[in-house]
Amino acid sequence: MVRPFYTLRESRPRDGFRALGFMVAPQAGTVDGVNEKSLAITLDYAFVTDSSPPNPVVTMLIADALASCATVAEAVQQIMARPRWGAGQLMLADASGDLASVEL
């Protein structure tokens, strides 16, 4: 159903790490991606019933983490510290072999 809307995007922030990632048009952010430091993050969506105030969606937090984090530990800390809208299961891996599964 969403396959026609998947787009591969190359990100080249001025002050950050380059990344390749999939996005679902027209949603902002990254669903799955890997940056130049070999940090990889993938999202499995989850149904959420929370009624929270509008915040950045999870995919925006993933894109931001890929641009600014080199390790799983950095990415988990950054993503968990920020308010967000939505839920999901994140899988993260980095060049050192560190792995994490995070439920949002």
Map each language-model feature to its residues:
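N-terminal nucleophile
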Residues: 1-104
